[in-house]
Amino acid sequence: MNLGKVDLINGSITSSMLRFALPLMLGNLLQQCYNIADTLIVGRVLGAEALAAVGSSYALIVFVTSVFIGLSMGCSAVFSMQYGAGDMEGLRQSIFSSVLLVGGVTVLLNVSSLLFLSPIIELLQTPGELQGLVYDYLFIVFLGMIPVCIYNFYAFLLRSVGNSFAPLIFLAISVVLNIVLDVIMMVSFGMGVEGTALATVISQITGSVGLWIYTNRNFPELCLHRKDCVFSGRSLRRITSFSFLTAVQQSVMNFGILMVQGLVNSFGTAVMAAFAAAVKIDSFTYMPVQDFGNAFSTFIAQNFGAGRKERIRNGIRSAVYITTVFSLFVSFLVFCLSPWLMAFFVSPTETEIIEIGVEYLRIEGSFYIGIGFLFLLYGYYRAVALPSMSVVLTVVSLGTRVVLAYVLASIPSVGYTGIWWSVPIGWALADIVGFWYYRTRLKDSSLVG
């Protein structure tokens, strides 16, 4: 059964983008709900130290997974263009080249992460009393990285041809299983952080295998035949050029976050715990504009491949309007509800942690429109075969964030509050650069019509 395929080349622009984006949003919502449930269980059952350990591990996990997610995302841009152009033979050849590239890099990265885990934990300035917990948690999670790669590759493949619903179904299965196993492992068996890591790995294997089987049964046009499995240097170079730059973008983004995590760690367990909870809330609240940016990218790429330039222009206008309205609404909610949101994660008696988290959310949450526009810019440049501009914008955003965070945090009167302020400033500078490039170089060029 072909679940939820959306035609992005014909019909209503706003409706098609929203219908395609909705499963992406729901999928990320499910993932964030799991993250919240996981944080809640760890914080309430295992305590502040375990919460700090798992929370500080999050940045490293995201950094490692961002490499093969970035590779798969870059591949999907090529897939979307070829699908929009009706080149199914070229699409299958690109899929084979992508399997070689993404699979090889994933295995290499997974082995390296396990071998160098201890020095990486020390490099992140993890407090001595937490290093053992962090190592135990990360070692198990990294053992299960390959299933994560498989799921994301097939999810991006299906999304590139307009199906964002099937990945949602298998993600939902994985998330529900993960939460159930979390409770069993930590509450019933008393396994600690190792239990939540093991639950994560088991659920990821289930979701990835399910999506792989579904794709092979329901999308025969995407299945590789012997004639497709022929090495093509041209195809591999094209895939690599897109995927490498997108992976660099994702890696730079998350490496910057990793450096910020190291700075946060230097302020002690209370700030670490507040940051861990606040980041989960933060990512939950701006997640819809991130997913809409990814849907927008697929829309642009398919229409770019099909030569529908006027439709691209109209799509840009619709996307900017939707992002603006949603971002302002969410910023208002987060500013008003941040004390309640923080109290949901930690005990009401942990007043210091709650106050730190509220400060973070009110500073960063007031400027979600900045990250909303940035996600549109990332998606647009990736879709029109300019992934290098996405890298430039990421370097501007994260470079500003990291440098400002370290500079401001070193001022005694500012302290860790400077880390929070560095984020929206980085977003704003990257938005300015991205809009300037579009207005001066691309808006009236033959690239977009």
Task: Name these PLM-found stretches.
Residues 19-38, 140, 151, 174, ...:
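Transmembrane helical elements of multi-pass membrane transporters/channels
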Residues 63-66, 178-182, 208-212, 284-287, ...:
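Hydrophobic transmembrane alpha-helices of multi-pass small-molecule transporters
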Residues 8-46, 59-74, 78, 103-110, ...:
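N-terminal transmembrane alpha-helices
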Residues 72, 140-159, 167-175, 196-209, ...:
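Short runs within selected transmembrane alpha-helices of multi-pass transporters and secretion channels
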Residues 48-59, 138, 197, 269-284, ...:
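Small-residue hotspots at the loop-to-helix junctions and early N-terminal turns
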Residues 1-21, 79-146, 188-244, 300-367, ...:
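Short alpha-helical transmembrane segments in multi-pass integral membrane proteins
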Residues 29, 33-52, 121-128, 184-191, ...:
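Helix-terminus/linker motif at the lipid-water interface of multi-pass membrane proteins
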Residues 51-111, 148-167, 274-338, 371-393:
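Small-residue-rich hydrophobic transmembrane alpha-helices
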